[in-house]
Amino acid sequence: MAVTINTELDPVFLKALGYLHSKSKDSAEKLKALLDESLCKGNDSVYRPQPKEVEQPKAMLSKVKPETKASSSTPSSSILSKPLASEKVKKEAEKRTADKMKVEINDIMDIPKKPRIEKTEARSSPVTVQLSKDLPVPDLSSFEETSADDFAMEMGLACVVCRQMTVFSGNQLVECQECHNLYHQDCHRPQVTDKDVNDPRLVWYCARCTRQMKRMAQKNQKPSQKPAPSAVSAVTPVAKDPSVNKPELKSKSDSANTFLAFKRAEVKASSAVSSNPSNSGVSSSSASGLTGWAAFGAKTASAVPVSGKLGTNSQATSGKPPSLSSVQKAGTVPGLTPSKAGSVSKSGSGGSSSTIPLKPLPPLILGKTGLSRSMSSDNVSKTGLPSPNPSSSGSVSSLSSQLGSNNGSSNTAGSNVNSSNKVAVDPSMQQSGAKGPTSQESQLNAMKRLQMVKKKAAQKKLKK
């Protein structure tokens, strides 16, 4: 029986459970009023609701048992008189109420949590709204402005001085080609004119870059001034006129060498003439020299009567055979005619002295030299080689001295020898008169062409 007594519940508690499980709207108020009444009656020791009961269901269950014990310990006659069936019904009701208590406790735990969350949200939401209204709005506006300006500055789209992108006529943005900074025409000092802005050919530099460039130029000029004289000395020969004239001088020397090649052959022929004691050797050597000269030019018949005229004039004036040999030598080497004519005339006269035979024949020598120089004076002057004259004259004078020593016995012997030479030399004279001038003209033409080609080549090199 003691067990049944312990299991009985307080009616106040059961009434409270009824209010708790009821779905009516006034159940919460009735439950609260019941709690107040129980507190007023002095049942605090029996039942004390705590806030932890909502959060801890196990503590609630553990408290329910001692409350039932305390309530059952109170003496009551009704409990003793109830039968066992009622006790069983109570047990079942207790089980049901215990299960319902667990469910309700869970519901109670969920119910107060929701208003608390709502309260926290209600408390926190105005704080966030205040933050969004008070702090970020002015900061965002200023940040947007500064970020736009910074972005424009980073991209190089704004003026460096005023940090603005505004552009209108008369105050446009101008970019420095060195530092690539943008300046307004009015912001830059000195101010940029419209002509500088609108001229596409102009490369504009800001004042700072121009100063830096001037300093760099001055620094570069100072060390370069010391080695400048050597560089100038190395460059000046190329820039001066003598360098332009050098290739022409070389061409002239080359042309002189080409003429010297032919003249050397003539000098050898004259030396061969000096070695031969007789005039027949002179005619043969001169003929061989003529064949070499004739190979460079075409034959012309216009020079033949000139040689014939020379021969007739010489025979008519002097009436002596040495004139033919002098005319022959005039045809071979025209620049050497005065000395050779004089030397052969000495051999014809047979005199041992060198000055006496020249006196009776001044007009003959002058006439011959004039005619021969008219044909070949240009060639001698252009070649610029007067050196063979003394050597050839010396060789011929030695030849004349030998002839004079051999034929010094009588004048008739010399005249006979010269007359015999005349017969042998006449055909060679005609050939020399016909071939000599043509070969010289061809040489002149060839040399002119060579000089023109070399001048053109030198001009092309200078242009490059």
Swiss-Prot record:
The keyword Repeat does not apply. It is found in: Nucleus. PROSITE patterns: ZF_PHD_1, ZF_PHD_2. A zinc finger (PHD-type) spans 156-212. GO terms for cellular component: INTAC complex; integrator complex. Keywords: Metal-binding, Nucleus, Zinc, Zinc-finger. It comes from the Eukaryota. The keyword Nucleus applies. Residues 69-84, 227-239, 339-371, 384-421 have a biased composition (Low complexity). SMART domains: PHD. Residues 42-98, 216-252, 312-445 are annotated as: Disordered. Its main location: nucleus. Residues 312-329, 372-382, 428-445 have a biased composition (Polar residues). Residues 85-98 have a biased composition (Basic and acidic residues). Belongs to the Integrator subunit 12 family. Component of the integrator complex, a multiprotein complex that terminates RNA polymerase II (Pol II) transcription in the promoter-proximal region of genes. This is Integrator complex subunit 12. It comes from Xenopus laevis. The lineage of its organism: Eukaryota, Metazoa, Chordata, Craniata, Vertebrata. The gene is ints12.
